[in-house]
């Protein structure tokens, strides 16, 4: 029986597909912002399963919702009603201000669902001729890895060697309002699918007016704005949604401040909606869009199952009751300001950017270099887990439950790692 980290890594290499390149650490336990490897060493988790663990590892209320429901009724399919789905649907639609929600499992499934909704609306409501609807997307996007989604990816790692590709998508530069305006001149455009902050691209934060201006343009052209908030939503950027802007969400409730909030026609959620314990995703829209899909035209055996619904309700309640978006804002400021003071002047550092607790450090080296990877190995040795993205960028996104003192300790460790690393160059 395998016991050491090496044993477990060897098992994965022998029996698992080689579609990931994990940091060499084998985890077996987590609590709050901390995780432990099989040898018992503790680490600060600064990835949060790509922002799926916003409420912290093993939150007792969320785990309790999972266990209690699993003991009672786990799965019915949607062939029958269940007693948890309706209450969840009411809670999430009221939370974010939409008429309807369609529950799915993974983020990629939710994006696929949004694409189908947009196309169906385009044909039934907007009147675009059959099979001619187009959806605008952005360069450097990441919305998943299904065959449809990779068809509009600009990342060769995602799409190369997996054609033929699905037609009906047009890419424009991110954060480019004039390019969007020009693309929207095509009467066959049905939707604009966009990340309010591009996470996988390296935490690219657009101009503050980008999403709101995009919404205005979409409305003027009768085009649906589809916000992919799978990674940015549920408090990660310091508000319930990144499209809330800097509204504040001071009470822990989604206040939808009309001066800052941009309302997407289709809202896509996932990751932290699960509380980090069970796959849950959701697509929200009003009746004019959602009710274009009828029975038999879309569905999922596990989507909206009793466990998922119960877990998601608990995950949302924890966010509100503990006002975690407020902590994300405070600790995010602490992270960026503290790191800039400590390492901002190093030649190794090209920049520090982000919003809330979704942040990135840009390493002053080429994307093809191993510098960011080597830094993550050094951070691991210092008890901090993070992962490079796009070669020379390190993303830092701890659970939103991280305390001020924990952040301070993590910053001190990071300062030591980056400073010592530069001295070896």
Where do the model's predicted regions map?
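Conserved N-terminal phosphate-binding loop of PLP-dependent enzymes in the Aspartate aminotransferase
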Residues: 2-425
């Amino acid at each position: 029986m395998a016991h050491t980290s090496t044993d477990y890594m060897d098992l994965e290499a022998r029996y698992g597909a080689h579609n990931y390149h994990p940091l060499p650490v084998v985890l077996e336990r987590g609590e709050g912002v901390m995780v432990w490897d099989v040898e018992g060493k503790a680490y600060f988790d600064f990835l949060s399963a790509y922002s799926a663990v916003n409420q912290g590892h093993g939150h007792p209320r969320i785990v309790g919702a999972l266990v209690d429901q699993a003991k009672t009724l786990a799965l019915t399919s949607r062939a029958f009603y269940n007693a948890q789905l309706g209450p969840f649907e009411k809670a999430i639609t009221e939370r974010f201000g939409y008429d309807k929600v369609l529950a799915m499992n993974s983020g990629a499934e939710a994006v696929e669902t949004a694409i189908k909704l947009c196309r169906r609306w385009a044909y039934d409501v907007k009147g675009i001729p059959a099979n001619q609807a187009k959806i605008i997307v952005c360069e450097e996007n990441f919305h998943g890895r299904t065959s449809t989604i990779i068809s509009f990816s600009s990342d060769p790692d995602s799409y190369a060697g997996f054609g033929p590709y699905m037609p009906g998508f047009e890419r424009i530069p991110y954060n480019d309002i004039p390019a969007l305006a020009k693309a929207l001149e095509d009467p066959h455009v049905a939707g604009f699918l966009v990340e309010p902050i591009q996470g996988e691209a390296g935490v690219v934060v657009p101009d503050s007016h980008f999403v709101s201006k995009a919404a205005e343009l979409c409305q003027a052209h009768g085009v649906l704005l589809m916000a992919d908030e799978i990674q940015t939503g549920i408090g990660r950027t310091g508000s319930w949604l990144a499209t809330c802007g800097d509204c504040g969400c001071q009470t822990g409730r989604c206040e939808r401040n009309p001066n800052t909030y941009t309302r997407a026609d289709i809202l896509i959620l996932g990751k932290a909606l699960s509380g980090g314990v069970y796959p849950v995703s959701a697509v929200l829209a009003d009746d004019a869009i959602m009710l274009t899909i009828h029975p038999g035209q879309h569905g999922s055996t596990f989507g909206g199952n009793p466990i998922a619904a119960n877990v998601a309700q608990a995950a949302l309640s924890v966010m509100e009751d503990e006002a975690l978006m407020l902590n994300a804002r405070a600790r995010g400021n602490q992270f960026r300001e503290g790191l800039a003071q400590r390492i901002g002047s190093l030649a190794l550092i090209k920049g520090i950017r982000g919003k809330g607790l979704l942040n990135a450090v840009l390493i002053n080296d080429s994307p093809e270099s191993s510098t960011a990877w080597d830094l993550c190995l050094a951070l691991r040795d210092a008890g901090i887990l993070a992962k490079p993205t796009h070669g020379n960028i390190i993303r830092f996104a701890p659970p939103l439950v991280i305390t001020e003192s924990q952040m301070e300790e993590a910053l001190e460790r990071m300062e030591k790692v980056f400073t010592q690393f530069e001295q070896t160059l």
